[in-house]
Amino acid sequence: MNATAIIAASGVGKRMNLGGGRSKQMLEIGGFPVIHHTIKAFQEAASIKAICIATKAEHVETLRTMAREAGFTKVTTVIEGGEERQDSVGNCIRSIRDEAAAGKEMPEAILVHDGARPFIQPDEIDAIAALSLEYGASVPANRPKDTIKCIGTTPGFFGETLDRATLLQVQTPQGFKADILIKAHEQAAKEGRYATDDAALVERYFPANPIRIYETGYHNIKITTPEDLPMAEAIYSSLSKKR
């Protein structure tokens, strides 16, 4: 299989209260930056042949150096991200298309991952890549542990309670056949439409292509708030013991 990973790592971590424009991807877990763990998983996934990273301008050279020194040979491109996450993914898609136009083989599938999710496992990446080729799109998710309620029309009060059995919490990496993801992003760019994840774009522009669920456990967290850091250290320790 020939799949390319896009890692969106341009976030400044506003909810982490880091200040000074620091990036949550550069916080350390187990002695290594969050983004190091993220890249390592894709480096070790057999399905992934190339990795494109979009990050803040001031971190481009840092990540290139990190990849080189860590032996992350699949990292072929580190570029500046955009204003929004979707813009960063779009920058990587354009880079992939430019490389294909220059003679490099176009990947069969593209997986888009959050740089702040360091605990996805190589075998999970391979499974999502395979499902995305088989079904056109595949997205990891897990079942919510809490009851989910809608916000009501009256400020400060709940509305209806949703049936938890019909809900999933969506994660990344989200995998797609390359042409589906590329066309969805191109159409969204033409319309100036933004979504919170790539699956939402594919749902809109390819409604006849249902997205295959890949159900995961609860280890694949996104580091978003300060409370996530001790949890991340615990997950890292647990996963390290299993290796």
From Swiss-Prot:
Protein name: 2-C-methyl-D-erythritol 4-phosphate cytidylyltransferase
Site features described as Transition state stabilizer, chain residue numbers: 15, 24
Keywords in alphabetical order: Isoprene biosynthesis, Nucleotidyltransferase, Transferase
Site positions (Positions MEP for the nucleophilic attack): 164, 222
Catalysis performed (reactions): 2-C-methyl-D-erythritol 4-phosphate + CTP + H(+) = 4-CDP-2-C-methyl-D-erythritol + diphosphate
EC number: 2.7.7.60
Family: Belongs to the IspD/TarI cytidylyltransferase family. IspD subfamily.
Taxonomic lineage from the root: Bacteria, Pseudomonadati, Chlorobiota, Chlorobiia, Chlorobiales
Gene that produces this protein: ispD
Enzyme class: transferase
Disulfide bonds: none
